[in-house]
Amino acid sequence: MIHRKASLKGLSRFFLLLACAALFTGCATQSPTASGGPGSSANPAATTDKKDLKDVRVQLSFLMQSLDAPLIVAINKGYFAEEGLNVSFERGFGNADTISKLGTGKFDMAFSDMYNALEFNEKNPNDKVIAVAVTQNKAPFAVLSLKERGISSPKDLNGKKLGAPAGDGPRKLFPLFAQEVGVDPKSIEWTTMEPKLRETFLLQGKVDAISGFSTSAIPSLLKAGKKPEDITTFYYTENGLDFYGNTILVKDSFAKANPEVVKAFVKAYFRGMQDVIKDPTAGLDAVIAADQSKLMDRQAEKVRLDIALKSMYVTPEVEKNGFGAADTARLQETIDQTVAGFGLKSKPQVADIFSDQFLPPKEQRQVPPAAERKPLS
């Protein structure tokens, strides 16, 4: 569903009414932004008049999810307002669509991946987009099956029927995955379906496995009654394709015209990320409370956030380099793999798609010490 935009003040009043009514119920997709909110600090910046702030329009990669907790926390606690920004957001309709709309100038910033952006840039050289920070150090690209199908290793996929939507990123990259794990891609029979039917096809036995994002597929399969031990997951990042996940993307022309705005956004976002790492339950609660549709499944969102916390947000690379950075050699290798997997004509270099000049100093984007991190509950 399409979600309405709201001012930072509007959501503050919304939360105040909830508190007065002793209600703090779960919601389901996404509401727009606000300064202040549950748990926000009593900071003058959090109540700065919106007319004094720079409006920044953001598009998510999909519906608002627990993976967006850093953004929601940064909004609620007034971190963007402290940097002079009034951030509003809308849901997305998939990574590729989000990038396309960013390129048209409908949004100032977006959350999506660099690899679809490479393809977009080749087709739209005059509307080039770039990544200014990595938000997910590991991509959730995966092939998933059920134990009952007898697929216990990637090689067991030979001759099987796989399912995914036509534009699915992991599906487009599957030939590279197959090459890494010893599967003949020509032996695979692909079935195409709508994204919302992907897990259903697997559950009904119409396909032997699916490609997609683990953060989407696993919560759906668990909600359908499967147990974690029933699900077999082959991550691309564990099989020779060490892709980064989502990033903060901006149009290149916007970044050049508004460098301080981009820097301010990135700085505030990673303050939110640090808070989520310290207290993921509070981050999850903030997302649930921010959604106005009241359809969000807290347990499914908890599973989604748990996956991100364990394998996407904090990795040895992030511990070493801080949030937002990218390893040049690793990124170039994945760019080269994308060129091959997507059949791109150009051969981009790291500087063509990623810039670290908008990141705050490393000391401001460090991973919180383990002793300061609460468990997700």
Label every model-predicted segment.
Residues 90, 129-131, 190, 276-286, ...:
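Surface-exposed patches in mature extracellular/periplasmic domains of secreted proteins
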Residues 257-343:
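Secondary-structure end/capping motifs
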Residues 79-83, 180-185, 224-227, 293-297, ...:
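Short helix-capping segments at alpha-helix termini
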Residues 328-377:
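Conserved C-terminal helix/tail region of periplasmic/extracytoplasmic solute-binding proteins
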Residues 88, 96, 192, 235-236, ...:
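Short linear loop/turn motifs
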Residues 1-53, 363-377:
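Short, low-complexity disordered leader/linker segments with a strong preference
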Residues 33-194, 199-204, 208-215, 234, ...:
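Short, glycine-/small- and polar/acidic-enriched structural segments
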Residues 116, 197-200, 206-296:
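Pocket-lining segment of extracytoplasmic ligand-binding domains
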